[in-house]
From Swiss-Prot:
Source species: Aeromonas hydrophila subsp. hydrophila (strain ATCC 7966 / DSM 30187 / BCRC 13018 / CCUG 14551 / JCM 1027 / KCTC 2358 / NCIMB 9240 / NCTC 8049)
Name of the featured protein: Small ribosomal subunit protein uS5
Entry domain remark: The N-terminal domain interacts with the head of the 30S subunit; the C-terminal domain interacts with the body and contacts protein S4. The interaction surface between S4 and S5 is involved in control of translational fidelity.
Function: With S4 and S12 plays an important role in translational accuracy.
Signal sequence range: none
Lineage: Bacteria, Pseudomonadati, Pseudomonadota, Gammaproteobacteria, Aeromonadales
Residue ranges the record marks as coiled coil: none
Subunit text: Part of the 30S ribosomal subunit. Contacts proteins S4 and S8.
A single Gene Ontology CC term: small ribosomal subunit
Family membership noted in the UniProt record: Belongs to the universal ribosomal protein uS5 family.
Amino acid sequence: MAKVESQAGELQEKLIAVNRVSKTVKGGRIMSFTALTVVGDGNGRVGYGYGKAREVPAAIQKAMEQAKRNLNKVELNNGTLHHPVRGVHSGSTVFMKPASQGTGIIAGGAMRAVLEVAGIHNVLAKTYGSTNPINVVRATVDALVQGQSPAQIAAKRGLRVEEILG
C-alpha cells in the first residue's frame, strides 16, 4: 500500500509502488527497481513521480524529486471537489464526485494516496478498466486538474458566481 512521510517543507510524501524490473542482455539479466510516489501539501497541490535506479532507495529518491518538480494545483471546496470529474490515462478511467462532510475517502489503492496528499477528505471515487498504479495515478491527477471552481466557470462564461450557482 502507501507509506507516509512528513517533511520539513510541509509536503506529504507517499510511496505507492516499488517494482523490480529487468533488462535482458547477452550476458544475462540486469535488475533494477522502479518507484512510484505522490507528493502533496494537503491543501490543493499534488504531484506524482516515477523513478528508476539499480537500488530501491535511489529509485525512491528520484521519484520524490520528480514529484516535487511536477506539482499541480487542485481546486477544493471544504475538503471535497466542486463537481464530478473524470480522468483517463491509457487503459485506466477514474470517476470522482463530491461527497458530504463525514463521508471520508471512498477510493482504493493508488487513487486513495493521491486524494489524501491533495487534501481531499470527502469524495466518492471509482476506477474502471486497468488498475495499473501508474495509469491510475496519472488519470487521477488528470481528473483533479480538470476541476474548476464556480468563480473560474463564471469568469469563463462572463457571468456572476451567483448566476452559476443558481
